[in-house]
């Protein structure tokens, strides 16, 4: 809150006062501290009562001020009054920009007496004031004082007899204690007084003022802080992806694969940055808190508070059904990994937030699970596992089990590894180091160097299988037999358990379903009435074959059956309360049961992960009937603690529907079926910010529209930039049901200075060229997917294809390879037998279901159209429409260690023909041919294989850089040994800014020592002056080293809402 009071000692010489209270005061103790600081600040002002009667003016303010709510900064309020001798402005919960603007106004005021009071939640170590967005520290204050405009105006003003006096009251500890009153360059122009002693007595006017401020600072209710969505609907994230949120002073990320979700930290802002995404999920399966800090827990604690408030409201009852459903929308929580211990303080400290988190978790019936590195050899915790889909492992690198210090104080460093079942799909490795010192992080990685999947930039299960490839036929046969066995052995369990769970969940999902039924007739305008076509092909192939394989009749024929199955109550089956979690096939349409004890104990999580925490999480919603038998097979087979994800198939026989873009894989896959491409769909390693989308939980497989921004070099941007809509191959299955699609668009934000950089076309990555105007056009054109696309069905808003239509080709690539060729299947081979799985459920009208795909820049340059607005989504007949989606494995390519999207700098990663237009669009499904990869299998030699030499590098797909006090310790050695396709710099604190340049220079030096030409993307979550300067000075080296720097303001748009985030798809 900022209050500005301007009074005048003489009528012509006014005085000024500015009070600032930042951030939400979320607890009573913090509110009392803020009020004490305000009182201290006002009473320390040595203004002459003859100049301004402060007591009287404060009384006038309380009775006559006006209140204004900011339309730009939601949650910010200003209270203002201008009297004869005093002008008062109070900003409640301001953003950092608002505070700096008001501070400039105060400095430029001609008043001879000025007071600045900084009060509010602040960090214990540095004293940095926490605001709604960002913080305010002495460094920010000096930056404002050093502003050229302010200095020039102050210097040009005729010097008064005595220079204006600015009194500042602020925290008395941390960096504020070291702020010198004498600011260079302001001597004789402005006199500063820091934290003077209290001089004025307490007064009635001051008491009234503080009472009114206390009322204005009442913390918002959890429902006001985390608002319900405008429309109810559940999302499903199928392909491996990671949302990178601006966590304020800390980290906030969200990893998802095949419907299994992991929230990593919560950020420092109580208005949780991840809320607008997770409120559309029915469950967050795991919460990983890397460290108990004020930079990582406030956002999570807000979510926990809301869950408690929802529970109380649900118990109290009342309210209309639809309204209650919208309010009681927060996802159920699974296991919570948290190392913490209790403490208490009025300042914002990690220990306080940890104590609060422990208390809230206890009230919710969730027992946090501490993490530490176990004995060697390192064994992972299996978070999720499903046959035919894959396995998600978590390796803990720090703290060690035998740590000398209390492990509750040590930061957790965790490595998530997704092992897909498809032999040619990419293994995904994501590192969340928290505040772990780099030296300890590297020590933890040494214990994992025996793992083959860390030795190569791109690894697939078939690489790791190596010599066992000859056994594929036998393996396929054994899988088939297991499937048959599963069908005969466990027929009844699903039909008993699921309806019970569904019945329990039904209240939460009644409204979304009802809304869907009402909305769909008006939205399905032009559906292709071919009911049989979609059913004659596997879903993966149908997805590749058409942008919109519609057919309203198909959905009408089957949807009612599959939708009602979960809701049919079976007598004698009590609702599952604390048993295994409801399978997603029911969670897709139904919300998870509101159990109070949601987390499974750690021993169960490790020993039988497949049964408790992962068995159900990968099932597709449409797999009610067709997939239940295979699921039973899974339940029988997954008792082992570390079963293999899937036995490799022959080279040409890829496993059927893998969970890349739709949750379809329920059973072991048959040999000979074309499968997904293994190349990294990493959508970020060179993407400037990606277009992304969650998938509806109500839908078996969502229509995956490859709606992306491929940024050509600046020279070509004006004429060749445009949105492309490539068709995805089997890896990204297109839906055969008549879904209406609301685009979920990520507005990329390339680094601001890129226009001044003359970039050569070859080494340029898509993220390093093009300006933000095109993206702002796009964002402006798509303020909400639901508002622009809903009136028309998908078949109207996208290039429409049916199974009988020829696949479109991009201009200039008449024979673009839709290519099953890229998936190990000859282009003209007959399609495989259709999968025996019912079609997906209809989609609720509020669901966002777009899968971001990336095309290489070469393909982007072939496409016409100079606009990146939503216009290209019109029908192909439109003259300005960019080419129809090229029927290719664009998504796969987009992830190719990102070098493939530039001019494919990976030396041996692509064959010479890959530089051609066709080759750039369809690659072999196997791993990108990486430089020095040895014979098949050498890349991913199993854990028992040859040991890597100490200090050898490890390859990751995405890695956060250590934050907190460890950020400044990141050096060249770290980047030499931790080689990631994407690095995320998060944590906008003062020390991070001070050490930023050294870290960025270390990145350049470390990358220069890599023996492989890999494209690297740097993703900052905050704006940094040091980074801007570094970018301008070193951008010429970025091209040579293959480094792309993104901006910090990427935006994801879903429906009629948007939130800041950068989505990285793998």
Curated annotation (Swiss-Prot):
The main location class comes to nucleus
From start to end residue, where is composition biased (Low complexity)?
656-671, 880-894, 933-949
Q: Where is the composition biased (Polar residues)?
A: 597-614, 766-775, 790-803
Name the residue ranges with Basic and acidic residues bias: 466-487, 500-530
What InterPro entries does this protein's entry cite?
MAP1, MAP1B/S_N
Which residues lie within the region annotated Disordered?
462-707, 758-950
N-terminal signal peptide:
none
Region Necessary for association with actin: list its residue ranges. 967-1066
Q: Where is the composition biased (Pro residues)?
A: 832-845
A single GO BP term for this record reads: axonogenesis
On this chain, the residues bearing Phosphoserine are 320, 472, 582, 649, 660, 665, 667, 737, 765, 816
Q: Which residues does the annotated region (Necessary for association with microtubules) include?
A: 720-973
- Residue ranges for the region (Necessary for the microtubule-organizing center localization) are 1-804
Q: Where is this region: Necessary for interaction with RASSF1?
A: 676-1066
Q: Which Pfam families has this protein been placed in?
A: MAPB1_N, MBL_MAP1B
Entry-annotated residues carrying Phosphothreonine? 647
User: Would you say which domain of life the source belongs to?
Assistant: Eukaryota
Q: Where is this region: Necessary for the mitochondrial aggregation and genome destruction?
A: 974-998
Q: Which GO terms describe its cellular component?
A: cytosol; dendrite; microtubule; microtubule associated complex; neuronal cell body; nucleus; spindle; synapse
Sorted keywords for this record are: Apoptosis, Cytoplasm, Cytoskeleton, DNA-binding, Microtubule, Nucleus, Phosphoprotein
Protein family:
Belongs to the MAP1 family.
What's its job? Microtubule-associated protein that mediates aggregation of mitochondria resulting in cell death and genomic destruction (MAGD). Plays a role in anchoring the microtubule organizing center to the centrosomes. Binds to DNA. Plays a role in apoptosis. Involved in the formation of microtubule bundles.
**PANTHER family, sorted:** MICROTUBULE-ASSOCIATED PROTEIN, MICROTUBULE-ASSOCIATED PROTEIN 1S
Subunit structure of this entry? Heterodimer of a heavy and a light chain. Interacts with microtubules and actin. Both MAP1S heavy and light chains interact with microtubules. MAP1S light chain interacts with actin. Interacts (via C-terminus) with GAN (via Kelch domains). Interacts with ESR1, LRPPRC, RASSF1, microtubules and VCY2. Interacts with ESR1, LRPPRC, RASSF1, microtubules and VCY2. Interacts with WDR47 (via N-terminus of light chain).
Instruction: Please state what the protein is called.
Output: Microtubule-associated protein 1S
User: Which species is the source of this protein?
Assistant: Bos taurus (Bovine)
